[in-house]
UniProtKB/Swiss-Prot annotation:
Ral interferes with the cleavage of DNA by E.coli EcoK restriction-modification system, by modifying the activity of the host methylase. This modulation allows incoming, unmodified phages to escape the host's restriction system. InterPro entries: Antirestriction_protein_Ral (IPR022759). The gene is ral. It comes from Salmonella phage P22. This is Restriction inhibitor protein ral. Belongs to the lambda phage ral family.
Length: 64
């Protein structure tokens, strides 16, 4: 199954975001763009960071 993320739906909601120029909170260091192995597991740090960012925004929407 493929999941498509609508960046217009999410990215524009973040105050710091300037339209996916990677200068917002979601910006990562070059070494974080690659998958890494930690404790025998493959980790995508960029995906973790953006997922947490979206989760925070969803919680804010629930509170409204």
């Amino acid at each position: 199954m493929t999941t498509t993320i609508d960046t217009n739906q999410w990215c524009s909601r973040f105050v710091k975001c300037k339209g996916c120029k990677l200068d917002a909170e979601c910006m990562v260091k070059p070494e974080e763009m690659a998958l890494v192995r930690e404790d025998g597991k493959i980790v995508d740090k960029w995906a973790i960071r953006t997922t947490e960012m979206i989760a925070r925004e969803l919680e804010k929407l629930k509170a409204i």
